[in-house]
Every structure is written in structure tokens, then in C-alpha cells.
Amino acid sequence: MSAVAKRTRRARARAEEAARPGSTGEKYREMSVAEFFAKNKELAGFANPTRALYQTIRELVENSLDATDAKGILPWIHISIRQIEGSEGRGGRPRYTVTVEDNGIGVPVTSMAMAFGKVLFSSKYVIRQTRGMYGLGVKAAILYGQMTAGTPVEVYSATKGSQYVYMMKLVIDVQRNEPRILERGEWNKRGSWHGTRVTLSLEGDWSRAKSKILEYIKRTAVIAPYAEIILETPDGEIYYFPRSTRKLPKPPRESKPHPHGVDIEQLKSMLRSTRASTLREFLVKEFQSIGDKTAQDFLEKYGLDPDLKPRELLKKGRDKLLRRLADALMEYPFRAPKSDYLSPIGSDIIEIGLRRMFNPEWVGAVSRSPKAYRGHPFIVEVGIAYGGGIEARSEPLLLRYANKIPLLYEEREDVSYKVVSSINWRQYNVDFPAPLVVLVHIASTKVPYKGVGKESVSDVPEIEAEIRNAVQEVARRLRLYLSRKAREEEAIRRSVTLAKYIPEVAVSLAYFLRPPSKWQPPKPEEVKKIQEALIKIVARHIELPPVDGKTEDPEAIVRRIVESVELE
């Protein structure tokens, strides 16, 4: 028997032995990623029909926004939710067809099947700020639809500059984690449309999910007032959120990893894929915040050979040297990560969104300077709106966002809630119940979510401190506004006390400004002349503080009061 045949026979024997129950009677087998998430759908936010319908809308809308504003395109997003009549699922639960269409960059036809049919296949596995992180969301929705409605996902897409519109109907092969295409087509593009339209069916509960879905869309419109969003509901309602600004945040850019954010496994992967011929070249080419001089100083400090070939660190017997390099990268005081890769919303856009949605009497926002945690850059932005159309509540209405995603669930688990609820708002002249809205946005190449459902952010000390500083910074401006407003109201109250007597005093003076022998009812023009003089005298003695940069005319206030008295 040849050596090859012997090896094949031994391999077959090992495979048969592995498939047989062991001494414990247990069988072992491999589970694909798709099968794992199909069996543990609650991990991705699909715990029940209510949450599943909400999560499906959220995942598709986030993909649309990433494909538009992140590429400098003013977003147009159309969402349709329709109940499928006579197709109740398990337990009589209704089924729905969800369609989301956008005007984004589209998906290349060569990637369409994998992008929608393979779990953890994504364009987001780079160091860049995106709404999605795991390459899971839309595939989790497709899996849930397969399991509850038994229908494929239908995708139409056209990229910018393409002459064709492509269509695919596919399902995910759960055992193999591969797309199975059921139908495909392509058509000549008649217009200039580019973007993606995704349609899938699933079990859901619209009556329970409605409030969350509407709130999600409203909060998306707050954070993205540059987007035009249309929502058609199963109730026959159409919600339209027009674009209120054409100003877009700057698109995010891909960045190199920072040395403080790299672990041993990531370092191994980088060493395998690098084209650098020396360790010094590897450090300069593959990391941010490392130039030639920094690389030389770093290698000298830790006694590492600058001419060592990177792949030498992956050979047997080099484990200690590899760990030494990884520890040194974490320890050395490199420059902070660059933040120009991030895409903050900007204080102007935050204020536009809050004004449009809440019509407040005062609004302020701040976009803080970049900071970093564990080698990952982040920017905290905060907006506060007060009064006007805001309903008074026993605590602030908190709007949480991470990489422009509205976070609606798990509020009390979030670091933003921890900070906002711990602030003594009375120090800022806010007494509850009060009409107060606080918006917190965290932009980062790696948001520290508490789970794959992306609903709450961990209380990382650096992020917590920045949120607190940002909230307090805007709250101080609110306090200044409220203090000036209180002084103005007090001045107006005093003005009312004086001004309401002006008509009566004017008539009396008209009598007494002539000798007693000529007393007679004064003429209206005489009273009017004296009244005008009194209005100017009283107005000169009223000092109104500027409120939100504006000062009301004291004379106009006195005149309004006098006119109201005359009408009584």
C-alpha cells in the first residue's frame, strides 16, 4: 500500500472515530455561524415578533444611511410595511412584507449574493466609523424571515455609473452559511437611479412594534435632518420627514490601527499579511501614530531588531518575542489616535434636527474635541433643547445615538443614562417636571456596545467622562439663558406694575396740568400726548438682559401693557 493511500486510510479512520459517540455517549459536530444565529436569534435583537419587526426596519435603514451619507449622497429612503392577508404564521401571528429602498451607492453584482446571503460577510470589516459593525444585521433579518415566513429575500441594486439594474432572490443555506440563489435577472437601466431595494417577509406584531418603529424613524430624522424619509405603514398611514438641510457631515475614512488597540491575534494577522520587509518598515506602514523616528526610538527602547523580517515573529520558538512586541505596543506612549477618520454630526446639524422635531424655545449643542480609549478614537456630541413644544417630564427625555444610530432599548443600561440621571439639574436652574431634551451621540471606529444587538453602550471611563463634560458644557449655556430669562421676566413684572397705571395717570395729569378754574374733561389728543411721554419715561427705567442673544424693546413691552389696559 502506498504512503498516500495509508495517509488517506488513517484520515478516514480518524474522521469515522470523531463522528462516533465517545465514552461519554456525546456526539460532536461543527455548527456554522448562520446556524448559530438562526438558533440564537435573540442575540441579534430578534427575540420576539415585536422586536423582530423593529430590528428589521432598523437594520435596513442603517444600511441605507451608510450607503448614502457616508458617501456624500443626500439620503432618500422609502420604507414600506404591508401585512400579508391570510398568511398567518405560528400561533396565528400575522406576517408582513418589508421593503426599504434608498439612493445609495448600490451593491456590486459580484458581491450581491454574499452581502445578503453569508453571515459575517461585510464591507465593514475595516477600521472605519460605520453604523453597522458585525456584518450580521441584515442577514439576521433574512434568517428570521426564512424561519418564520419561509420566503426568500428579493434584492434590486444598481451602482453609480452602471448600465444595468440587477435582481436576485436568495435564501441563506443555514448549514453551510452560503447564499443559495433561486432567481436572478438584469435589465438595462433607463434612468440614472442608483441604490438598493430590499424586500423580505417575516412574522411580526405591528400593533406592538408601531410605537418603537415610529420613534426610531423620528429620532433618525433628528440626527439626520439632511435625509428625506418616507414611511408607509400597514394602517395605510404615510409619515413624511422632509429634508430640512442640505448640509452633510463629512464622510468617515478608513484608518490604520493604533498600537494601543491591537491584541496578539490581530498582531499575528497583520504580520502574516504585511508586505513590509523589516520590523521597522512594518511599524511605519501598518500603524497610525508611528513615523520613522518614533519607530526607531520604540525599537531601541525595547531592544527589538529593526531589520528583523516580520514573518520571523510567527515561527516556532518566537512566542516570547511576539508577546514582548505586543506588550511594548500597548505600553509605549505613542501619539493619540487620529480623529480625522471620524464623522461627527456637528453642532449645527444637531441644533437643526432638535429645532425641527421639538420646536423648542432654546437649543444648544457641542461637538467635543476627540479623545481615545484603548487606542480607539471617539468624539462625544451633546445637544440640549428646552421649552417650546417640549412636554414637561419628571426627568430629561434622553435621545441616545452611537455612530448616528438611535438607541431605543436598554436605556437604563447605557452610559449616557448613567451620566444624565446623575447630574443635579437644579444647579442649572432646571426644576422638574421640566420641558428638557438631552441628545448624546458617540462617534467612534469601535463603539463599545454591550451586545451584538447594539442597544446600549458600556460605561468606559473615558467615554463616561467626556459625556459628563459635554452635557455640563451645554447645560451651563442653558443656565445662562434661564437666568437671563428670569431677570427679563422680573423686569417685565415690574414694568406691568408701573405700566398698567399709565392710562389713569395720563388722564389725571391732563386735569392737573391746567389751573383749577379751567378743569374740564381733557381732550383725547391731550391724554394721548401725556401717555406717550409716560411710556417713554417708564421704558427708559427698564433694563432687560439679552436672552439667547436677543433683547426685547422695553418701550414695545410697555406699549402692549398700556393698550391691554385701555381695552379693559
Swiss-Prot record:
Catalytic activity line of the entry: ATP-dependent breakage, passage and rejoining of double-stranded DNA
Annotated EC: 5.6.2.2
Main enzyme class: isomerase
Transmembrane segment boundaries: none
Molecular function via GO: ATP binding; DNA binding; DNA topoisomerase type II (double strand cut, ATP-hydrolyzing) activity
ATP-binding found in the keyword field: yes
NCBIfam families given in the database record: PRK04184.1, top6b
Quaternary context: Homodimer. Heterotetramer of two Top6A and two Top6B chains.
UniProt protein name: Type 2 DNA topoisomerase 6 subunit B
Species of the source: Aeropyrum pernix (strain ATCC 700893 / DSM 11879 / JCM 9820 / NBRC 100138 / K1)
